[in-house]
Amino acid sequence: MDPPTQSHNSVRTVPGSNHSHTDLIISSFLSFPDSSPISISNSFDRVLDRALASASADESVQDRLVDRTLELASLLLDSTRRCFRKRASVHNSNSWSLPPELTIKVFSMLDTKSMMQAAVCCTMFNKCAMDRLCYSHIDLTTSARYADKGVVSTMINRAGKELRSLKLGRVVRTAGSDSAAPLLSGSCLSPLAYNHGFLGSRLRSLRLYNLRPIKYRSLCDALSVCPNITDLRIVGLYNLTEELFNSLTKKCRLIEHLFLETYGYPRTLESKAGSSLVEFVTNCPNLTSLTLIRFGLTDDWARNLAESCRKLKYLNLSRSPTIKGRFLRELGLSCKENLLKTLILRSCPKLQEKEVLEFCNSLLTGNFKSIRQIDVSSNSGLASSDRGKRCNKPNFPLERLKEERSDVTFVADFPSTSSGKRYGVCDEEELRLIEMMEAEDDEVDEEDDSDDDTDDVSDEDESENDDDMGMGFDVDYLL
C-alpha cells in the first residue's frame, strides 16, 4: 500500500511518539561544534547534493526535497526570531524600571502615533499598549495621512468605556492644490453612537480639524450622543447654520470651552444662526471660554454673546470681517461686573481706531474691572475715521493705562508688511501655525464685500518622516 501523499509545501508531521527523537536531532544540530562559515556551508552543500542524488531520478521528488529543506530552514529562522523576542522581552521586563500600570499611564499621555511606535518595539510594550487606558486620549492629528475611518473606529472601540478625548484631522492647512486629500469626514464619528451612544457619553473633549467634506447631519448626530462633553473645537466649518447650534443647545449643555473656526470667505452671520448661537451661549451655564474665528459677527451679535454668558472669562472673536468695535463701549456700560478676563480681537479689518480708544478710556474710568488682557493686533492696522485709510500708529493712552491699570496687558501691535512679523489668532501654538499658513491669502480688505472663491483650502502634506517606523498603522497592532 502506497504511503499517503504529502503536500510538497508542508513539513512532514512527526508522530507524537517521535517528538523526543526529533528534539534530539535538532539539539544535536544546534550543538554542532564551532567551525568556519565556509566549512559549514560546504557541509550543507555536500549533504544536500547526496540527498538529491539518492532521492530519485524523478525531478518532482527532488523539487519536493528542496522545498522541504527550504521550509525547514524557514521554520528554524522563525523559531530563532521568536526566541530572540522572548529573551528581549524578559530583558526589557527586568531592566524596565516602571511597573505595567505606570507604563500604561505613560502610554496614555502619548499621541496615538507615538504610542503605536512604542507598541511595535517589543512584546512587553505591545501588551501595555493594548490596555484600554492607553486609548483614553486618542490623538490622530499627527498621523492624518494614515488615519481613515477604519482606524478611527478601531481606536474608539479599543478605548471603550475609557474614552475621554478625541482629536482628528490636520491642524495646519496651506493654500494651493490638494495633493493629499484628507481621509476623514464627519461620518468618521459614527462609532460614538454605537450601543445607544455609550462611547459618546464617555467623551469629554472633541477636537476636529479640517474634516472635509463635513456633513452637518453627521456632525450633529455625533454631538447628540456626547452629552458630557466639556471641550469642543471644530476648525474648518463652512456654511454655518442654526442646526449646529440647536444641536449643541439641546444635547451639549456642559460645554466649558467652545472653539469654532470657519474657512472660505466669512459672510455675515444669518439671523437664524446668530439667534441660535446666542441661545446656546445663554443656556450653557458652564461656558468660560468662547472662540469664534472668522465669524461674520455684527457688533450687536458680539454684545449679545458677551452679555448672555455671565461666567465667560475668555472671548476671542479674531478675524471677524464685520466687527467695528461699537460693542466695546456698550459692553462697558452693561457688563461692569462681569468675569471677562481676556478679550482677543486680532486681525479684524473693520475694527475702528476710535472704538478701541473709547474702550481704553472706559478702562481708565473703572469699567471692566475683571479684564486682564486685551489684544487688538493686526497685520494691516486699524480702520481710521478717514474712509479707506488704515492706522498703524494709533494714539492710545498706553502709558496712563500702565500706571492706572497695571493689572491689564494691552497688546496693540501693527507691524508693517515689510517687517515680516505676523500675528496669530490665539495664544495657542497650533492656532498660531494656522494663522501663519493662512495670513498671506486670507486678509480681507475693508472695502471688499464681494464673495471670494469657495474652493477648499488644501491640507498641508505631512512630513516625509511620517513614513518612518512603519506608521501605516500596521494591521497586526490595530485589529
Curated annotation (Swiss-Prot):
Q: Which GO terms describe its cellular component?
A: nucleus
Cellular localization per UniProt: Nucleus
Signal recorded as keyword: no
Entry keyword set: Nucleus, Ubl conjugation pathway
Which GO biological process categories is it annotated with?
protein ubiquitination
In terms of superkingdom, the source organism counts as Eukaryota
Segments carrying the region annotation (Disordered) are 435-479
Listed Acidic residues bias regions: 437-469
Query: Which Pfam families did the record assign?
Result: F-box-like
**Residues spanning the signal sequence:** none
Swiss-Prot/TrEMBL domain comment: The F-box is necessary for the interaction with ASK proteins.
Q: What function does the entry list?
A: Component of SCF(ASK-cullin-F-box) E3 ubiquitin ligase complexes, which may mediate the ubiquitination and subsequent proteasomal degradation of target proteins.
Assembly information from the UniProt record? Part of a SCF (ASK-cullin-F-box) protein ligase complex. Interacts with SPK1B/ASK2.
Instruction: Report what the protein is called.
Output: F-box protein SKIP17
Designated gene of the protein: SKIP17
